[in-house]
A protein has these predicted regions:
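Soluble acyl-CoA-dependent acyltransferase catalytic core bearing the H(X)4D motif
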Residues: 1-10, 29-42, 47-459, 463-494, ...
Length: 516
């Protein structure tokens, strides 16, 4: 990560939207098993391993640097006072020191804001658990990372064998920067670069790079922002044909009567899950078989994500029905979709989302899954043309945005507007692909990695799943004022999975919950 790299508008938005009731960090609850003959200090071994690899994950040593007067997005700069002991902590669990206890502690910890004066991440190591297990709760601000980058970071930090791999130390000495040049000379170079581009105006516009001062005084920030706005305007103009095509496709779909029916199904009914949340969280996790889930998706003619949505739908439907609050109209889910290209491991956010009906108005599990497959296919078709627009929208920058966005977020939070406004979606469901091979850290085998995501005003429940080896690890996080004990909801998932398998005549094997 280049020192002084300014956050994109999408990354920075997670900072501006953050309030004490709505922290914007993501994390995980990992479970390790120590070797039977292990005699060391896992906390110290783990910390030493992280220290030796900090240079291959530069985001771990980067802190935020605000622009003067908050007139522009902040930048990532290397923390010259970085102290590993402010980021990795030894923690203890009360009796009975099992996974259920760890889940309750993780829910409490996840509600606490990260210190913005330091790099925005923390690890907590819980030793002394049952069955020679060790728990690891990690959290990192969403401004620095999305699910795809998080999975890449996992592969960077962990090993694929019990013996830690050797990592080359960082290269000594900093690379010399470019010689300072007169700003007029840089402008001339940029102009020459632009006019010598191929005749393809779109390509020339996309490749335009105007000079920056790279300084942090107000005058330089104003100049750099002006250069950025010019670049953005030129690139926007260069992308007009693509954007016009995307908008035309969207309008064409909307004019189709069948598409209008699909859009109507995406309107979210109000539920108990769509209220303002407190600063407290409830968390729980559970695992099911990945291969069996894929087989189920194949039998149903859908994708793995459809099965994930069907399981979330079944759990939410059952919970609301038991509390006599299930609406007649189907609930919807906000589903993040990654824009990250294969091999891209940059620590930033490259996502957009779609809204999908999850057929909670259908009782039969098989019919519900089939309806979800049909609805998700239509939602993808509706949202596909918007993919081309997302890079333009996510890079919009405006002077003064930090202050204005933070004021609006605070007003939204304090006024409880989500209690009266119609919800954009009822729940959030996210599926993050993870490693298929077994991972290790400091010689300990990684058994599970349960995601711990974000609960927001108006969408109190977030269900995120991470694939690992031959399992799907589900993490349920919710505002505790809405659902005080989300473990109750989490325990329903194995039963919903069994019901789906029974509907498709698949064998049902044991399913292990995170809290067992």
């Amino acid at each position: 990560m280049a020192d002084g790299k300014k956050l994109s508008s999408l990354d920075a938005s997670f900072l501006y939207l953050e309030t004490p009731e709505m922290p914007m960090h993501v994390g995980s609850m990992a479970i390790f098993r120590l070797p039977d003959d292990y005699k060391g200090d896992f906390f110290e071994d783990f910390k030493a391993m992280i220290v030796s690899r900090l240079h291959i994950a530069p985001i771990l040593k980067a802190r935020l640097e605000k622009a003067p007067l908050d007139i522009d997005h902040p930048s990532w700069v290397e923390d010259d006072q970085f102290d590993i002991d402010r980021h990795i902590f030894r923690a203890s669990l009360p009796q009975p020191r099992d996974r259920a206890t760890l889940e309750r502690i993780v829910g409490w910890m996840h509600a606490k804001l990260l210190n913005r004066a330091r790099p925005l991440w923390e690890f907590y190591v819980f030793e002394g658990m049952k069955d020679n297990e060790v728990g690891l709760y990690s959290k990192m601000h969403h401004a620095a990372i999305d699910g795809g980058a998080g999975a890449a970071l996992t592969n960077m930090i962990y090993d694929i064998s019990p013996t830690p791999r050797k990592v080359d130390p960082p290269t000594a000495g900093a690379k010399p920067g470019p010689e300072p040049r007169d700003i007029a000379a840089n402008l001339l170079d940029s102009y020459q670069q632009f006019i010598t581009q191929p005749l393809d105006a779109s390509a020339a516009a996309k490749n335009l790079q105007l000079p920056r001062t790279g300084k942090s005084d107000i005058g330089s920030i104003l100049f750099d922002n002006a250069m950025y706005q010019i670049e953005s305007a030129v690139r926007f103009a260069g992308n007009i044909p693509t954007m016009v095509k995307s908008v035309s496709e969207v309008l064409g779909k909307i004019s189709d009567p069948k598409s209008r029916e699909s859009l109507a199904s995406m309107v979210s009914p109000p539920t108990m899950l769509n209220k303002s949340i407190s600063s407290e969280r409830s968390f729980a996790g559970v695992s099911i078989s990945l291969s069996r889930s894929k087989a189920l998706a194949k039998q149903a003619g859908g994708k793995l994500n459809d099965v994930v949505l069907a399981l979330a739908s079944g759990v939410v439907r059952r919970y609301l029905k038991e509390h006599s609050t299930l609406p007649a109209k189907s609930l919807t889910a906000a589903v993040p979709i990654s824009l990250r290209e294969e091999g891209n491991t940059e620590a930033n956010n490259q996502v957009f989302g779609m809204i999908c009906s999850i057929a909670t108005n259908i009782e039969d599990p098989k019919a519900r899954l089939e309806a979800i497959i049909a609805q998700s296919t239509k939602s993808k078709e509706m949202s596909h043309p918007l993919r081309a627009l997302m890079p333009q929208i996510s890079n919009i920058s405006m002077l003064g945005a930090p202050m204005m966005m933070q004021i609006l977020a605070l007003v939204y939070s304090r006024s409880n507007l989500s209690d009266v406004l119609p919800p954009a979606a009822n729940i959030t469901v996210s599926n993050v692909p993870g490693p298929r091979q077994t991972l290790y850290a400091a010689g300990a085998e990684l058994l599970h990695i349960f995601p711990v995501s974000i609960s927001t005003h108006g969408q109190a429940l977030n269900i995120t799943v991470q694939s690992y080896r031959d399992q799907l690890d589900f993490g349920f996080i919710v505002g505790a004022n809405i659902i005080p004990h989300v473990q109750v909801m989490c325990d329903m998932l194995p039963e919903e999975f069994a019901a789906l398998e029974a509907a498709y005549a698949s064998p049902v094997a044991d399913i292990k919950g995170a809290a067992e």
